[in-house]
C-alpha cells in the first residue's frame, strides 16, 4: 500500500536524517571483524577447556582397568561423552545494539553474552580471559587488549586501531535465574554456591539482555520502518537531555507497540508521528497505563525506573514535537535543515543499495551456529543475491547481444505476416495448436503446445524453405552428436569436452527457442514414457557455480543409455529423452498426426462455447448418432445430464459423454484446516537459554 501523501514530506526528512546518523561502511566492517574474531576465539577457548576436563577425567578413570569387555554400546557412550553437549562454555550470543541492528555513527560499545553450564565464578572468568589472549593470536592478526572486570562479571576487549571499539563479554548461566525463582517460591536450595561466584545481579542483567535481543529480533525487525524510527529516536535521546532516560529497552518497547498495532505498513514519517502520538497521550504518566515488559514472567512495568518529573518532561517534549510535525516543521524535531519542497529529478544515490534493517550479518543470530565465517579481505559484505546481480550485469555488458530467434528474423524479413490457427487438438491439460502462415503464395503449417511455440515452428519452416539461418543449427548439431554416441559409457570414462560444449549450446538455444519439443510438438519425456513405461532418470554429474549450474541426466532404454545435459534437471531429462527418441524411434508417428479425416459432426459438450476443445477418441465412447432429446436435459437433475453440484455426471454409456458422477461433492473447506503448533507464533515471554549457540554443534 502506498503511503499517504500527507506524510511524504515527513518520510523524506526522516530518511535524510537516518542516512546522516547511520554508521559508515568502514565502521560496520570494523564491528563485524571484532565480533567475529571474538566469537571464534571463544569457541577455541571452549574447546581448550573441554579438552582439559576430558584429560582430567581420563586420568581419574585410568586406575580401573578391571572391566572384562567393552561392548559396542559402551564404545558409543564413550564417544558421546567425549563430545558432551553440556560443555563448560555452552555458547556465545550477540546482544544489545549489535544483535538488534541499532548501531549509530559513533557507537563504540558492543556486547556479547557467554553462557556457562554452571554458575560463573571468578576463577572461570580468569581462566577464560587468560586463554583468550592466546587464542586471539591464532585467530587474527589484529591486536586486542583483554581486561578482566570482576566487579561487572565481564571480560572487556579493546582493539588497538581506529575506531577504538570496546567489546563487553558478560558471563552468566540459566541456573542463576532458576535459583531466584525457587527462592521466590519458598523452596530451599540443597546445593551451595562456590565461594568465588560472580555477582548474581550482573548475571541476571545479562540474561535479561539476551531475552530482549531475542524478543526484538522476533517482533520488531519484521515491522516496516520500526528499526529506522528507533535509530532516529536514539539520536534524539543523545541530542536532547530530556529524552535520555527513555533510551534503551523502554524506547524499543514503545516503538514496537506503537508501530506494530497499526492496521497497515507505514512509512518512516508516519511511523515516527505515531510514536510521538503514543507518548503525547500520557502513556508515561504515573496515572497512565504503563508499559508491560513481555520478557518477564511476572507482570512488571518497563518504565518503573523513570521519576515523576522525567515522565512529565518527556510527555511535554513529545507533545511539542507532535505540534511541530503537524505544522510541517518536523525538521526542527530532527535537528536538521528543511529539505527543498521540489524533489530534484536526478536522485540516483547509492543509499537504496544499503539494507538498513540488517547492519551486522547475519541478522538472525540465534538461528546460526556460534562460529561465524570470517569476513572477506576485500570487505565485500553484501548479500549473495546482489553479488549475483552484479555478475549478471557484467556478463550482459561483456557479451554481444543475443541472436534473434526464427520468429523475429522472419518478421524482420517479411513484416505484417498473418498467422492463423488451423486446429486445436489433444486433451485440455496438454493441447496441441496448429498454426499456418502464407508467404509468397506458399502455406506453411506447424504444431506446438502453445500458439507462440507453433508460430515459432512455422517461422523455422519458412526460413528453412528460403534457405536462411534459423538459429536452430546449434541445437541440431548437438542432437546429431548425441545420435552418434548412444553407446553405454562406463562410470570411470570422463565426459568429452565437446559434449559439454554441445550441452551448453543446447541450453542456450533452448533459452532462445522456447520449450524443448519433439518433431510432433510434445515433451520428449512424456512421449518417451508413452513408448516405454517405468523409465528411471539418473543424475550423472552436477557442475558449475551457483549461478551457472550444469546437470547431466541419463536414461536407459532397451539396454542402451542416453545422456542429456542442461541448466537444470528438467532440461537435462528432456535432452536425454530426445536423444533416445531420435535414435530408437526415428520413424514413429503419434496419434496427433494421424491422417485427418472428415468425421460426422459431434454435438459438443456444453454447447458451441466448448466446440472443438475435445477430441472424440481420447478414451471415450464415441457414437455418431446424437443422443435422444430426453437424455440431454440441462436443468438441475435433468435425467443423466444434470449439471447441478453433487448430481449425476454428464451422460454416459454410448452417448459420447464423461461418466463423472458426483460433481463437486463435498464442497470446499472440508479438508482445509490448519494444524495448531506450539511454535506458530511468538510468545510474549522468552526463556533464557532457548536458541543460543551450542559450541559442540558448531
From Swiss-Prot:
A motif (Bipartite nuclear localization signal) lies at residues 372-390. Residues 51-88, 374-403, 473-522 are annotated as: Disordered. The keyword Transport does not apply. The keyword Lipid metabolism does not apply. GO terms for cellular component: cytoplasm; nucleus; ribonucleoprotein complex. Residues 399-468, 520-586 form the DRBM domain. Residues 61-71 have a biased composition (Acidic residues). Keywords: Antiviral defense, Cytoplasm, Developmental protein, DNA-binding, Methylation, Nucleus, Phosphoprotein, Repeat, RNA-binding, Transcription, Transcription regulation. Residues 5-379 form the DZF domain. Its main location: nucleus. Residues 72-81, 374-384 have a biased composition (Basic and acidic residues). Phosphorylated. Phosphorylation affects nuclear translocation. One of its GO terms (molecular function) is sequence-specific DNA binding. Residues 490-503 have a biased composition (Polar residues). It is found in: Nucleus; Cytoplasm. GO terms for biological process: defense response to virus; regulation of transcription by RNA polymerase II; spliceosome-depend formation of circular RNA. RNA-binding protein that plays an essential role in the biogenesis of circular RNAs (circRNAs) which are produced by back-splicing circularization of pre-mRNAs. Within the nucleus, promotes circRNAs processing by stabilizing the regulatory elements residing in the flanking introns of the circularized exons. Plays thereby a role in the back-splicing of a subset of circRNAs. As a consequence, participates in a wide range of transcriptional and post-transcriptional processes. Binds to poly-U elements and AU-rich elements (AREs) in the 3'-UTR of target mRNAs. A component of a ybx2/frgy2-containing mRNA-ribonucleoprotein (mRNP) complex. Also a component of the CCAAT box transcription factor (CBTF) complex. This is Interleukin enhancer-binding factor 3. It comes from Xenopus tropicalis (Western clawed frog).
Amino acid at each position: 500500500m502506498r503511503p499517504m501523501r500527507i506524510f511524504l514530506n515527513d518520510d523524506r526528512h526522516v530518511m535524510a536524517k537516518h542516512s546522516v546518523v547511520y554508521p559508515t561502511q568502514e565502521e560496520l566492517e570494523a564491528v563485524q571483524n571484532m565480533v567475529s574474531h571474538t566469537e571464534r576465539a571463544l569457541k577455541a577457548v571452549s574447546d581448550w577447556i573441554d579438552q582439559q576436563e576430558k584429560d582430567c577425567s581420563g586420568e581419574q578413570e585410568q586406575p580401573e582397568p578391571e572391566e572384562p569387555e567393552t561392548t559396542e554400546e559402551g564404545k558409543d557412550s564413550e564417544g558421546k561423552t567425549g563430545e558432551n553437549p553440556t560443555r563448560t562454555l555452552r555458547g556465545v550470543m550477540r546482544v544489545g545494539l549489535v544483535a538488534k541492528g541499532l548501531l549509530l555513527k559513533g557507537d563504540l560499545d558492543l556486547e556479547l553474552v557467554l553462557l556457562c553450564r554452571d554458575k560463573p565464578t571468578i576463577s572461570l572468568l580468569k581462566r577464560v580471559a587468560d586463554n583468550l589472549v592466546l587464542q586471539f593470536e591464532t585467530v587474527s592478526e589484529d591486536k586486542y587488549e583483554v581486561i578482566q572486570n570482576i566487579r561487572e562479571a565481564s571480560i572487556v576487549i579493546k582493539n588497538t586501531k581506529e575506531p577504538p571499539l570496546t567489546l563487553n563479554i558478560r558471563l552468566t548461566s540459566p541456573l542463576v535465574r532458576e535459583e531466584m525463582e525457587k527462592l521466590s517460591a519458598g523452596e530451599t536450595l540443597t546445593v551451595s554456591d562456590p565461594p568465588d561466584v560472580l555477582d548474581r545481579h550482573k548475571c541476571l542483567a545479562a540474561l535479561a539482555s539476551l531475552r530482549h535481543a531475542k524478543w526484538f529480533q522476533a517482533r520488531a525487525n519484521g515491522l516496516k520502518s520500526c528499526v529506522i524510527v528507533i535509530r532516529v529516536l536514539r539520536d534524539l535521546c543523545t541530542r536532547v537531555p530530556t529524552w535520555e532516560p527513555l533510551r534503551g529497552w523502554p524506547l524499543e518497547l514503545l516503538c514496537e507497540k506503537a508501530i506494530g498495532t497499526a492496521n497497515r505498513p507505514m512509512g518512516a514519517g508516519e511511523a515516527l508521528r505515531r510514536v510521538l502520538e503514543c507518548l503525547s497521550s500520557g502513556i508515561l504518566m504515573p496515572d497512565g497505563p504503563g508499559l508491560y515488559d513481555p520478557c518477564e514472567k511476572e507482570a512488571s512495568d518497563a518504565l518503573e525506573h523513570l521519576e515523576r518529573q522525567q515522565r512529565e518532561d518527556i510527555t511535554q517534549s513529545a507533545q511539542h514535537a507532535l505540534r511541530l510535525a503537524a505544522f510541517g516543521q518536523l525538521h526542527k524535531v530532527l535537528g536538521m535543515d528543511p529539505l527543498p519542497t521540489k524533489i530534484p529529478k536526478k536522485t540516483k544515490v547509492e543509499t537504496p543499495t544499503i539494507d538498513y534493517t540488517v547492519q551486522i550479518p547475519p541478522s538472525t543470530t540465534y538461528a546460526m551456529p556460534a562460529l561465524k565465517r570470517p569476513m572477506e579481505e576485500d570487505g565485500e559484505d553484501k548479500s549473495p543475491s546482489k553479488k549475483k546481480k552484479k555478475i549478471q550485469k557484467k556478463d550482459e555488458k561483456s557479451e554481444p547481444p543475443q541472436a534473434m530467434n526464427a520468429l523475429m528474423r522472419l518478421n524482420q524479413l517479411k513484416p505484417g505476416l498473418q498467422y492463423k490457427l488451423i486446429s486445436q487438438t489433444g486433451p485440455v491439460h496438454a493441447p496441441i495448436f496448429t498454426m499456418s502462415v502464407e508467404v509468397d503464395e506458399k502455406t506453411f503449417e506447424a504444431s506446438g503446445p502453445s500458439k507462440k511455440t507453433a508460430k515459432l515452428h512455422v517461422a523455422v519452416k519458412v526460413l528453412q524453405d528460403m534457405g536462411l539461418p534459423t538459429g536452430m543449427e546449434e541445437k541440431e548439431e548437438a542432437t546429431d552428436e548425441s545420435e552418434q554416441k548412444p553407446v553405454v559409457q562406463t562410470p570411470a570414462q570422463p565426459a568429452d569436452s565437446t559434449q559439454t560444449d554441445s550441452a551448453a549450446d543446447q541450453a542456450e538455444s533452448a533459452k532462445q527457442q522456447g520449450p524443448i519439443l519433439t518433431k510432433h510438438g510434445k515433451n520428449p519425456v512424456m512421449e518417451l514414457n508413452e513408448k516405454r513405461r517405468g523409465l528411471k532418470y539418473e543424475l550423472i554429474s552436477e557442475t558449475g557455480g551457483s549461478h551457472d549450474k550444469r546437470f547431466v541426466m541419463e536414461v536407459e532404454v532397451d539396454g542402451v543409455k542416453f545422456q542429456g545435459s542442461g541448466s537444470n534437471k528438467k532440461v537435462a531429462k528432456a535432452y536425454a529423452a530426445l536423444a533416445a527418441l531420435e535414435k530408437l524411434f526415428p520413424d514413429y508417428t503419434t496419434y496427433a498426426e494421424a491422417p485427418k479425416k472428415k468425421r460426422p459432426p459431434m454435438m459438443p459438450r456444453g454447447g458451441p462455447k466448448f466446440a472443438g476443445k475435445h477430441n472424440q477418441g481420447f478414451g471415450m465412447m464415441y457414437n455418431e448418432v446424437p443422443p435422444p432429446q430426453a437424455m440431454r436435459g440441462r436443468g438441475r437433475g435433468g435425467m443423466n445430464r444434470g449439471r447441478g453440484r453433487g448430481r449425476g455426471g454428464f451422460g454416459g454409456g454410448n452417448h459420447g459423454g464423461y461418466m463423472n458422477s458426483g460433481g463437486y461433492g463435498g464442497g470446499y473447506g472440508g479438508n482445509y484446516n490448519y494444524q495448531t503448533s506450539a511454535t506458530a507464533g511468538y510468545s510474549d515471554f522468552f526463556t533464557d537459554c532457548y536458541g543460543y549457540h551450542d559450541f559442540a554443534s558448531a
